[in-house]
Curated annotation (Swiss-Prot):
CDD domains: CYP_GliC-like. The keyword Cell inner membrane does not apply. It comes from Aspergillus fumigatus (strain CBS 144.89 / FGSC A1163 / CEA10). Pathway: Secondary metabolite biosynthesis. The gene is hasH. This is Cytochrome P450 monooxygenase hasH. Pfam families: p450 (PF00067). Belongs to the cytochrome P450 family.
Length: 550
């Protein structure tokens, strides 16, 4: 039996699909004349099979056989080929990789081994689950390219095609060089002192506005409030990240940006569903998703142009001014500016919300750890800002443990450089030996973060238990390939220096002000409830907040 983050027994996964890829077999055929009779019989058989098992099953079988033959990946000893779930038309495993990653991660490794192949539409992606293979992958990785269109199709390029996470080569290095000073360690520390810490404190002070209407619970000590973790927390990281580009924003600008985020999410949902939206056909057929994308693009360009004009007059040092003027000088393109801001805010809204809510929910479910954290925070409250930046504290370990157990990792390069449980696809320009298979150059490779963060023997027999203190005895160098958080290689997360501070600042102020616990009935099948309408499966968990004594 497997265990949840707090040691809860979970049932073993039982839903198994017959997803084996066809293994190529060499056959010697007799020479048969192609007579009208034999062709007619063959055609009749094809029609009969199609009627009996259905046209989609026939298409899936034929295409899987063809793709498995064309994209064979041999073992180093030449005795077998890499296996994996069968291709299914039209998306392959793309939807499962987004929406059922946690379940599929376990199923696929159990069925196909530690190195296997899945399909992003008709594109093969090699999945690695062993830290040793991760190390091999990222040796000599300075020239790795991100997969074209992230293997997600054409419509994605209309949202983020020129953003930092999707471009390669000189375009990437030029844009990254422009952005790095804005998100350096020094800049992150200054941001914490100037606004982040105060912003987190103000947000927690006003969190009562998100209290559920029926969530006031009378206790002997007075009233406590009940909040939904996701709904109460998601605006905080969204506007903190936005302010790094736009500076201090008005309430009207906040609401306009929030609406743009909603419109972005509608289009992204169509991207996740795949199908026709993977190609330009979605444009030629004038689909609703394409119309929504076009309307969003115009509104997004207008918003950034107006913000630039306003900040140029009132706050010329704001990053949006510097980035826009770099585009005007021809150093960047306008789309590189707007798409990078979009991936840093909209593409990461659900991701960052999940990271923060995971950290808080796991603490709420562990009163002992919460009490230890409170004692540590009390000892360090006189030097709060320095405490939040440190990486040798229980506060930091709580963040790492939540990232380990709940690796929802993002689509883009700004925050956490991974998609759900699987890293952002990239194509090494050289052959790699991974899991004893010879992976050809330019083949897409992804890392399974659930395998690295949880099933990895490095984490010991309690690898599914929530125990933040485990990090106290682990050297940073040991985590390099045993913990998937901010990505690997030269394209490691641009926002790594500020990401942890955003999370830890709000955790510090929330738990300093409130005793946080779970309301009853917040688990389903041994894990916390989730909102299945979100592609990230955000938590649908209610928290009880009881004010601490001053």
């Amino acid at each position: 039996m497997q265990k949840g983050p707090c040691g809860t027994e979970l049932g073993r996964l039982s839903s198994k699909q017959n997803m084996d890829s066809a293994q190529p077999t060499k056959l010697d055929f007799l020479t048969v004349p192609a007579t009208p009779f034999s062709i007619g019989v063959l055609a009749s058989i094809v029609v009969l099979v199609t009627v009996v098992i259905g046209p989609k099953a026939v298409i899936d079988t034929v295409l899987n056989s063809y793709l498995s033959l064309v994209h064979r990946i041999p073992a180093a000893d030449g005795k077998k080929y890499m296996s994996g779930p069968a291709y299914t038309f039209p998306n392959g495993q793309m939807v499962d990789k987004f929406l059922a990653a946690r379940t599929r991660s376990w199923e696929w490794e159990e069925k196909y081994g530690k190195t296997y192949r899945i399909w992003a539409a008709s594109i093969p992606e090699v999945v690695i689950t062993d830290p040793k293979d991760v190390e091999v992958l990222y040796q000599q990785s300075t020239d790795h390219n991100k997969a074209p269109q992230a293997n997600a199709g054409w419509l994605l390029t209309q949202l983020l095609g020129s953003g930092l996470g999707l471009i390669n080569g000189t375009r990437w290095s030029t844009l990254r060089k422009t952005l790095d000073p804005m998100f350096s360690h020094r800049a992150a520390l200054q941001y914490l002192r100037d606004s982040l810490d105060a912003g987190a404190q103000d947000y927690v002070a006003g969190i009562h506005q998100f209290a559920k209407a029926d969530g006031q619970v009378q206790t002997a000590d007075g009233k406590v409030m009940v909040i939904n973790a996701t709904q109460a927390l998601q605006r905080y990281p969204f506007f903190e990240v936005a302010s790094m580009f736009y500076g201090k924003m008005s309430e009207a600008e906040h609401e306009r940006l929030w609406d743009l985020g909603r419109r972005y999410s509608e289009v992204f949902a169509a991207i996740v569903s795949g199908g026709i939206h993977r190609s330009k056909l979605t444009r030629y057929l004038n689909t609703k998703a394409w119309n929504n994308a076009r309307d969003y693009q115009k509104a997004w360009r207008d918003f950034n142009r107006e913000i630039y004009t306003a900040r140029k007059m009132t706050a010329p040092d704001t990053p949006i001014v510097a980035l826009t003027e770099a585009a005007e000088r021809g150093e960047l393109t306008p789309n590189e500016v707007t798409d990078t801001i979009a991936e840093s805010t909209f593409a990461n809204l659900d991701i960052v919300t999940h990271v923060i809510s995971s950290c808080i929910i796991l603490l709420a479910d562990s009163p002992e750890v919460q009490n230890d954290l409170l004692q540590e925070m009390e000892k360090n409250k006189a030097d709060r800002e320095n405490y939040i930046t440190r990486k040798d504290t229980l506060l930091h370990y709580c963040l790492l443990e939540s990232l380990r157990l709940r690796p929802v990792l993002c689509l883009k390069e700004y925050w956490l450089t991974q998609v759900k449980a699987f890293t952002f696809p990239e194509n090494p320009p050289r052959e790699k030996i991974l899991g004893n298979f010879v992976v050809p150059k330019d083949t897409t490779i992804i890392v399974d973060a659930f395998a690295i963060n949880i099933r990895n023997p490095f984490w010991g027999p309690d690898n599914r238990a929530y125990r933040p203190s485990r990090f106290a005895g682990i050297k940073q160098s040991q985590l390099r390939y045993n913990l998937a958080t901010f990505g690997y290689g030269p394209r490691k997360c641009l926002g790594q220096h500020i990401a942890d501070k955003i999370v830890k600042a709000v955790v510090y102020h929330l738990f300093s002000k409130y005793r946080v616990s779970l309301m009853p009935m917040q688990a389903v099948e041994g894990d916390f409830k989730v909102d299945k309408t979100s592609w990230v499966a955000l938590y649908d968990v209610d928290l009880k907040l009881e004010p601490r004594e001053s």
